[in-house]
Amino acid sequence: MFVILNGSFGIGKTTVASLLARAIPGAAIYDPEQVGFVLRRLPAWMLGLARRPPDYQDLAIWRRLIAQGARRKHRHASVVIVPMAFTNPDYLDGFAQALGATAPVHLLCLVAPLDAVRARLTERANKEGREITEFEFRRSQECVEAHRAPNFGIPIDATREPAEIVADIQEKLRL
């Protein structure tokens, strides 16, 4: 089984994914951002591009690699939890379809008001001794606005404590 844990940048996907993985025997986390971080370091010409798009999610190679990686992870884990901030419904749908040939896919989307997401981002930045970045500020707004649409997964209220969110997910998925 795959659990795609979509949600805004800074909404708590990583925290919820970690708690969920600990709560489900045989579960593991697969983080597509790691693939994006690697691709971001490569020069555009290595990716066959004249210039790099601003978002690595726009790279077709990223979308292919994350599906391959998640399927490989599934060989070693009964449940693969995938935390990722998808804002393009076509990319999310393509990813879910690629995984669906391997195992059942559950799409969940952590949702919260923009002010709650930005408060979390500010708190995180303060703990790290820095200011919230322009990227974090802009990306949080893009995500919150996009995730109001119904095609990003079953909405999960992320204004609650992480343990409550995990319990809700387990109940919804009967885990």
Predicted segments, located by residue:
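Conserved phosphate-donor/acceptor-positioning beta-strand/loop module used by diverse small-molecule
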Residues: 101-121
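Small-molecule kinase domains that catalyze NTP-dependent phosphoryl transfer to phosphate-bearing small molecules
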Residues: 126-168, 175
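ATP-binding Walker
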Residues: 11
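P-loop (Walker A) phosphate-binding loop of NTP-binding proteins
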Residues: 8
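Glycine-rich phosphate-binding loop used to anchor ATP phosphates in small-molecule kinases
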Residues: 57-103
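Walker A/P-loop
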Residues: 14
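Hydrophobic anchor at the beta1->P-loop junction of P-loop NTPases
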Residues: 5
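Conserved substrate/cofactor phosphate-moiety recognition/catalytic segment
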Residues: 18-66
